[in-house]
Every structure is written in C-alpha cells, then in structure tokens.
Amino acid sequence: MIQKLFLLVRSLVILSIMLSLGNLIAYYIPSGVPGSIWGLLLLFLGLTTRVIHLNWIYLGASLLIRFMAVLFVPVSVGIIKYSDLLIEQINILLVPNIVSTCVTLLVIGFLGHYLYQMQSFTHKRKKVIKRKRKSGKTSQLVC
C-alpha cells in the first residue's frame, strides 16, 4: 500500500514538474503556445529519449485520464455561462476556423497528390530503366 502510494506521488510529481517547466518556457518564450502544451512536449521528449520511464508516470496519468470528464466540467460550465458572448463574437471565431480548415485540406490534398505522382513516376522510371538494361539499350538512357 505504501509502495503504491509512493508510485502515485512520484508519478504526480513528475507530471507536475513537466507542467511547471512548460509554464516556465511559456513565460520566457512568448510564442502563444500554452505552458501545458510545452509540458506535454517535454514529457513526450522525456519518454521518447527514455529519460522518463513509462512506469514512473503510469499511475498518475491513468488516474488523471480516469477522471478526465470531471476535470473538463469547469470548461463546459464556462462555455454555457458565456454563451451570449460567444454568440456575439461568432464571426471572429468561425471565419478563421473555417478558412484555416479549408486551406489545410487544400494544402494536404495537393501535397498528397504531388507526392503520389512523384512516387508513381519514380516507380515507372525504374521499370523503364530496368527494361532498357535487359535489352542492352543503355546508350540511349538519360537519367
């Protein structure tokens, strides 16, 4: 029981340290990225580089995930409380979201199409080169 309590406290302390470091970075680098996101990035880097082991934070993270719905209730209450303000500012909120979504979809679509064409062209070019090498017509081949 005491060991499990120690593991829980250790995991919550590590998560709190990552959050505090993220808030510190957000304070010194005013980029508009919240401290919690910086903290998540630091935690991700720590986990991927194995500076932080997954079992060190597992208990605290699973506890927070289990009660995530309860933790988001204040946000929902805030949205309901200030719904009149949100309705007044709907143009300012919706237009950038719709435009950025459309631009993102277009860019991803064109990029995907371009990369698909490049990949299929490379595959076809390799086929032609292979066929010409088999037939012995390498003098006409220009790469």
Swiss-Prot record:
Stretches of the chain forming a coiled coil according to its record: none
Location within or outside the cell: Cell inner membrane
InterPro entries in the record: LrgA/CidA, Uncharacterised_UPF0299
Primary location: membrane
Keywords (A to Z) from UniProt: Cell inner membrane, Cell membrane, Membrane, Transmembrane, Transmembrane helix
One Pfam entry name: LrgA
Residue stretches spanning the membrane: 1-21, 33-52, 60-80, 92-112
Similarity comment text for this entry: Belongs to the UPF0299 family.
Protein name: UPF0299 membrane protein CGSHiEE_04225
